[in-house]
Amino acid sequence: MALICHCGLIVTFLAFVVPLPYYIEVPGGSEDIRQVLKVNDTEDKEAGAYQFVTVGVQHATLAHMIYAWLTPFTDIRSAQETTGGSSDVEFMRINQFYMQTSQNMAKYQGLKTAGKDIELKYLGVYVLTVTDNSTFKGILNISDTVTAVNDQTFDSSKDLIDYVNSQKLGDSVKVTYEEDGQTKSAEGKIITLENGKNGIGIGLIDRTEVTSDVPIRFSTAGIGGPSAGLMFSLAIYTQISDPGLRNGRIVAGTGTIDRDGNVGDIGGIDKKVVASAREGAAIFFAPDNPVSEEEQKAHPDAKNNYQTALEAAKTIKTDMKIVPVKTLQDAIDYLKNNP
């Protein structure tokens, strides 16, 4: 009898502590941007708040899995889906690169929209991942910066990707890159990627540098990912150009931001709606872009970010207004026209 009891205790203990090859995603926090952003060395003392929203991600144990199965807005993801095969340390590092790029784009868009001078310089692309079938596996590493392909430089990662996609399968390709401050080059082959296009098999994101006379400082240690771009941009614009724009309201939202002010899709938006509603937000900005053809073919019932956010809001019966946006200007216009 004692042995049975002890075994039961051991199993219970293991259920809570032994990690499985899965992660769980839960509603995270909805934080006041003033905690992590300072613009022009001036405090934002206006009533209300802009909030950026996070999704909580952690290694799953058996106990976590049971909790996730029983709890709304809690998802189970495989380790491959979540980290792309990267270690936890690499995964956090990758998300910090996303955050850095997001902050630079937010500075650029926020100040540019406010009519301030700012220069955005494209330095290349950070290497985030290298696929197992890439001929650059073992050569390129996370945080290396690709600066040229076949001795050609580019003005954006899109231009680089388009060029590489245009090469023929099996073609030789020369990649110039920076590693630990040293310029190096390596040759490999064009391969077929998972999406059927030609490429070199690396995950990447823009590496940029911004220069402005307006000091902007972020304090986001321990926070990663690109999804706060819209709200960072909006906060910068407001403090510089229109301090009363939010008019005392708590305004939350999510979405990436690019150099043209477009708002990009993000993951886990249903959980972000839940987190924002818990913190009393009156407005939630959601990206409103069409579902891609590939996604529509794979999942005919797929919804875009805005539709998913609306559905989540209805489920939790919140009065928070879900507002669709495609650009930073859409968000600004909504706040101006709905004071």
Residue spans of the language-model regions?
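Conserved PDZ fold ligand-binding element
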Residues: F136-D159, S276, G280-E293
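PDZ-domain C-terminal substructure recognizer with occasional recognition of PDZ-binding tails
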Residues: A114, I161-L204, A309-D330, Y334-P339
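Second-shell loop/turn segments in exported
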Residues: D88-T101, V130-D132, A148-N150, I216-P226, ...
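PDZ/PDZ-like groove recognition
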Residues: A114-I142
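Hydrophobic membrane-insertion alpha-helices, especially the h-region
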Residues: M1-P19
